[in-house]
Amino acid sequence: MGVFNYEAETPSVIPAARLFKSYVLDGDKLIPKVAPQVISSVENVGGNGGPGTIKNITFAEGIPFKFVKERVDEVDNANFKYNYTVIEGDVLGDKLEKVSHELKIVAAPGGGSIVKISSKFHAKGYHEVNAEKMKGAKEMAEKLLRAVESYLLAHTAEYN
């Protein structure tokens, strides 16, 4: 089994604490609201939101995937860190066993933040991971982040 790493950094004008609170801690409710064209629903099927929690995420029509099942691995409120693993779903196809993500939001000069994501694509057997698949995951995450960011800019009193 090979492991393929992908890292990305995305700047945001939203301060780290506010972005973590909205995008991560309340993301299950907020993201389907602000990006229904991407995510139609997030359902907690086990756990209290902390490590071990299992979530079913259903994609909107028009997205090439139907659903994923994620396991929360770590939530660190003090350091704005969130780790989770995609453990099921058609996004994995027949070549991936799982995809682990480490997300950290850090303060940026000027009051904004930087969202750092490190992803590990765990291939089944000797399969290689298509670079387009990794790029597609980054683009979807950025689209969701921008939707949350736009919402927060329009609703300045929320998530403070």
Curated annotation (Swiss-Prot):
One annotated Gene Ontology cellular component of this protein: cytoplasm
InterPro entries with a match to the protein in the record: Bet_v_I/MLP (IPR000916), Bet_v_I_allergen (IPR024949), Plant_def-hormone_signal (IPR050279), START-like_dom_sf (IPR023393)
Pfam families from the UniProt entry: Bet_v_1 (PF00407)
Coiled-coil ranges (or none): none
GO biological processes: abscisic acid-activated signaling pathway; defense response
Alphabetically ordered keywords of this record: Allergen, Pathogenesis-related protein, Plant defense
GO-annotated molecular function: abscisic acid binding; protein phosphatase inhibitor activity; signaling receptor activity
Extra information: The sequence shown is that of isoform 1A.
Family the entry assigns: Belongs to the BetVI family.
Name used for this protein in its record: Major pollen allergen Car b 1 isoforms 1A and 1B
Origin species: Carpinus betulus
